[in-house]
Amino acid sequence: MKRFFENLFSQTERSVLNTGKKVGAGIAAGEWKNTEWGYPIATQEVIFLAKVFQPQHVKRHPYHIVRGTIAPLAVTLPLAFFVLNYFGVISSKIGFVIALSSFIGGLTIWAISIVFDSLYDQQHTYEVKRGLVMGMMMFIISEIMFFFSFFWSYFYISLSPNIAIGCVWPPYGLTVYSYMGLPLLNTVLLLLSGAILTDGYTILTEQKAVHENNEKVIAVEEAFTNLMNLYTKKQSINTLTFVDERREKFFAKNDQNAEKKEIAISAGVKELRDLDWDLYFFENPQNMEPNYKAPTDLSVIEYALITIFLKKRNKVIKTRLYFTLVCAVVFLFCQGYEYYFAPFSMNDGIYGSLFFLLTGFHGFHVLVGSILIGIITIRFIVGNFDLLNVGTKFQIFKNKSTGFACTLFYWHFVDIVWIFLYIVIYWWGSR
């Protein structure tokens, strides 16, 4: 068992995961500083190292080997159905609902498999993360080329309208949307969502608890700073690292037999409960019981500080993710409302075709971006980001938030495309 943990901690690309077992305090999950995988403490839980999820196989190369999955078929077959349905080859409302559900489910399965390979199977090395980011960048560039061709068509006909449409743009007799109203609201929604999502990612990568300078946050930050200084001091004066020292202490206390381990678990839970009481009395001194003795074990205080910090930080980030999702859903609703009550249709000449093609293609990208943001939100809820050190925003290939970063890139791409759409179609095209 000891050799297993020595091998486990020697691999810097590994991150210890939460197994959902509350086993008390006094457990060192890893060095919070100078490691790639940070400090893996899950919200309201302490990590039990003996139950760490082990990878299914050892990866002896840095390259990306994917496992078999039905996700690509679940995504591409609905796209083929949408094309056939558009041209009238297949016409079925039930089939459309099934295809849309399959598309969303396929993207979800795909995302889950990527998360599994990254966190649970530990297959995402530096090269793999770089490949994922570069793949997202190439995908965004290809989508830019798509929109470039559509905008080219729009400018080709609008800058030199022919006699078939009355030599004017928009075509004579066609009622078009004003750049005020719903288009302006959609612009505000997308820009606001991009700013909120960026702020959430900044909080995650810069390890901020919250922006507001209230007394509780300041107290937590001061205590956290003192704890970090203590770690640094202990590491500098001891031959063993703080992690090794704490791990050895844990095994000395808890690796004797099952009965002693259960006793240690109960004691740890009791210490945490006592700490909760101590925090309560700190905020309500008038209720302090006489001769009350607060816990002084560093591991208990360590656990409490980490838990408070992660709870505050992740709560703020999840709130921003919720707001981003709300903005995206409202945008899609407004777009659908605009389509339903549009004074023209796709069959009303070149203007209607280009309008619905450009805005509809963008709306599809908003839907995909909403799914990606929803997946990141679910990952926050289940505790995938309950790490202190996820890396900075300038360490995309090394940090533990590569998926969040790629989602942020994609959402900014959606924002920028909409700004061009708003200026070209709604503002310039309606003048």
Curated annotation (Swiss-Prot):
Swiss-Prot/TrEMBL catalytic activity: 4 Fe(II)-[cytochrome c] + O2 + 8 H(+)(in) = 4 Fe(III)-[cytochrome c] + 2 H2O + 4 H(+)(out)
Keywords, ordered alphabetically: Membrane, Mitochondrion, Mitochondrion inner membrane, Translocase, Transmembrane, Transmembrane helix
Gene Ontology biological-process entries: mitochondrial electron transport, cytochrome c to oxygen
Locations listed in the record: Mitochondrion inner membrane
Membrane topology (UniProt): Multi-pass membrane protein
GO annotation, cellular component aspect: mitochondrial inner membrane
Record-level Gene Ontology MF annotations: cytochrome-c oxidase activity
Residues that span the membrane, as ranges: 70-90, 96-116, 132-152, 176-196, 321-341, 356-376, 408-428
Enzyme kind, highest EC tier: translocase
UniProt EC number: 7.1.1.9
InterPro entries xref list: Cyt_c/ubiquinol_Oxase_su3 (IPR024791), Cyt_c_oxase_su3_dom (IPR033945), Cyt_c_oxidase-like_su3 (IPR000298), Cyt_c_oxidase_su3-like_sf (IPR035973), Cyt_c_oxidase_su3_a-hlx (IPR013833)
Keyword Membrane attributed: yes
Subunit (UniProt): Component of the cytochrome c oxidase (complex IV, CIV), a multisubunit enzyme composed of a catalytic core of 3 subunits and several supernumerary subunits. The complex exists as a monomer or a dimer and forms supercomplexes (SCs) in the inner mitochondrial membrane with ubiquinol-cytochrome c oxidoreductase (cytochrome b-c1 complex, complex III, CIII).
Similarity comment: Belongs to the cytochrome c oxidase subunit 3 family.
Protein purpose: Component of the cytochrome c oxidase, the last enzyme in the mitochondrial electron transport chain which drives oxidative phosphorylation. The respiratory chain contains 3 multisubunit complexes succinate dehydrogenase (complex II, CII), ubiquinol-cytochrome c oxidoreductase (cytochrome b-c1 complex, complex III, CIII) and cytochrome c oxidase (complex IV, CIV), that cooperate to transfer electrons derived from NADH and succinate to molecular oxygen, creating an electrochemical gradient over the inner membrane that drives transmembrane transport and the ATP synthase.
Record-given protein name: Cytochrome c oxidase subunit 3
Lineage: Eukaryota, Amoebozoa, Evosea, Eumycetozoa, Dictyostelia
This protein's encoding gene: cox3
